[in-house]
UniProtKB/Swiss-Prot annotation:
Signal peptide limits: none
Free-text description of this protein's post-translational modifications in UniProt: Cleavage by CASP8 relieves autoinhibition by releasing the N-terminal moiety (Gasdermin-C3, N-terminal) that initiates pyroptosis. Palmitoylated.
Family per similarity comment: Belongs to the gasdermin family.
A Pfam family reported for this protein in Swiss-Prot or TrEMBL: Gasdermin
Protein name in UniProt: Gasdermin-C3
Disulfide bonds: none
Domain remarks: Intramolecular interactions between N- and C-terminal domains are important for autoinhibition in the absence of activation signal. The intrinsic pyroptosis-inducing activity is carried by the N-terminal domain.
Keywords: Cell membrane, Cytoplasm, Lipoprotein, Membrane, Necrosis, Palmitate, Transmembrane, Transmembrane beta strand
Organism in which the protein naturally occurs: Mus musculus
GO cellular component: cytosol; plasma membrane
Region of interest (Triggers pyroptosis), ranges: 1-226
UniProt-listed GO biological process terms: programmed cell death
Coiled-coil intervals, chain numbering: none
Superkingdom to which the source organism belongs: Eukaryota
Length: 480
């Protein structure tokens, strides 16, 4: 149970309970969401939209020699969070074997956060200001593609250096069938300890307001509700890599936007799991069209990145592909870029779009889930995990409130020992409360998006592994 930066950010957002407050997901970008920084909204397919810092502030775009509003700074607010998990279970769910598995984990933070903001009355100073005659090149791209731009008007920054710490440990008592399977005796286990420094000034959460640019002047709307486009009146140049606006609206409705009042029994019929299933299958069916060599490079490269559980590398690769910049990267990300430069795959299949789709799903997950996915591939758990996640999503997807459900015992039977602990931890990280000895749980609306992204990631990796059945990832030290 790793306590990552993005998880801490989401937790702080929950505790602040601020309307329209969004968490910063990546520590490497934590200084790029400060006041006046400009963000480009980019769709993550069905999962959600992402705000990408463009590297400029609003002040960089306006004509010089103008007054700048003074930000309001709040007093630091302390946030302390400690979370621990202690799971223990027998391995005889289906009387396959006798033994035991235990998982112990803890993680948390002690952090001080303060808000810097520019309220709407103070923003009046910047309204209808003239832009520079020569604007940065990214503005031309955004105008042509009708990308919406936003400006950060409130940021919650860490007021002093702090540290995220944690430990996770799996202990496995193996007997009978599992003793033969794992070829170990008695107890075995794996333990990981970590610490993540968060420097002063890192932004954990922010609020944004939309920019509207017309007649070489800039207007800041009171909110980010997208009532207008940033570049109104500009014709849209369709991009093959993006879903249509209507389809994207439906997809976004799957998560939050179209939730009906609590008086309804369920959401509209078109907002069900079949829509997500169709989207994922449309992507995974294209993977077998790639050559075996390309598929193996993609699978092995992603496994290397997932083992590290470092979303910064995945995030950097995703941003490069979204901006169509095949620059230099070291490590496994560089191998994927090399394949994209070769452009030797099936001309009917866009390799960049497929890789981008998986990256967008993975970025919804936590750092510890990334590592758990790699171990799931290694233990060949994916088919069972896809079936289990499907059984949870399919009946509950359309319900916009918490309802109890029961995990089917026959779906747990193949997931024994460490495999069961890994799978349950994946589900817990999505926001579901799971107990190894109890198949009952409760559907939580907030788990809908991460659980859907987990379904997409598992399905994608399963298809790659199926096509590379002879591919055997090397076992990492300390891994059973």
């Amino acid at each position: 149970m790793g306590y990552s930066f993005d998880r801490a950010s989401k937790d702080v957002v929950k505790k602040l309970q601020g309307r329209d407050l969004r968490p910063v997901e990546c520590l490497s970008d934590a200084t790029k969401f400060r006041l006046f920084h400009i963000l480009q909204e980019t769709p993550r397919s069905g999962w959600e939209t992402e705000d990408i810092p463009v590297g400029f502030t609003l002040l960089d775009l306006l004509e010089p020699n103008f007054p700048v509003p003074e930000p309001e700074v709040s007093a630091p607010k302390p946030f302390i969070h400690v979370q621990s998990t202690d799971l223990e279970a027998n391995l005889n769910v289906a009387d396959i074997a006798r033994g035991g598995v235990g998982y112990v984990g803890y993680g948390g933070y002690n952090i001080e956060v303060q808000s810097t903001s520019i309220p709407n009355p103070k923003l009046e100073i910047l309204q209808n200001r003239k832009l520079l005659d020569k604007l940065p090149t990214f503005m031309k791209f955004c105008r042509m593609e009708r990308k919406n731009l936003y400006v950060v008007t409130e940021a919650y920054e860490v007021s002093k250096d702090t540290m995220l710490t944690g430990l996770s440990s799996v202990n496995l008592l193996v007997k009978g069938f599992f003793k033969q399977l794992f070829k170990v005796r008695g107890k075995a286990g794996r333990s990981e300890k970590y610490s993540i420094p968060i420097p002063k000034g890192s932004v954990l959460a922010y609020k944004k307001q939309q920019l509207v640019i017309e007649n070489n002047t800039c207007v800041i709307l009171p909110s980010a509700t997208k009532k207008k486009m940033t570049f109104p009146g500009t014709p849209k140049y369709a991009s093959a890599s993006e879903p249509t606006e209507i389809y994207r609206t439906e997809l976004q409705g799957l998560w939050i936007n179209d939730i009906e009042p609590i008086g309804r029994i369920q959401e509209p019929a078109h907002l069900d799991f079949k829509c997500l299933q169709y989207e994922v299958s449309e992507q995974t069916r294209l993977l077998p069209e790639l050559s075996k060599d390309v598929q193996e490079v993609v699978l092995s490269s992603f496994l290397s990145m997932l083992y590290e559980g470092d979303r910064n590398v995945l995030h950097d690769l995703m941003k490069m592909l979204e901006l169509s910049q095949l620059g230099h990267m070291d490590g496994p990300g560089g191998k994927i870029l090399d394949e994209l430069r070769k452009d030797s795959s099936n001309p009917c299949v866009d390799l960049k779009d497929l890789i981008l789709y998986l990256l967008q799903a993975l970025m919804v997950l936590s750092d510890s889930q990334l590592n758990l996915l790699a171990r799931s591939v290694e233990m060949r758990l994916l088919p069972h995990q896809v079936e289990l996640v499907t059984s949870i999503l399919q009946p509950n997807f359309k319900y916009p409130w918490n309802i109890p459900f029961t995990v089917q015992p026959q779906l747990l039977a193949p997931l024994q020992g460490e495999g069961l602990a890994i799978t349950y931890e994946l589900l817990e990280e999505c926001g579901l409360k799971m107990e190894l000895n109890n198949p009952r749980s409760t559907w939580d609306l907030e788990a809908k998006m991460p659980l859907s992204a987990l379904y997409g990631s598992l399905s994608f990796l399963q298809q790659l592994q199926k096509a590379n059945s002879s591919f055997k990832p090397s076992l990492r030290p300390g891994y059973i």
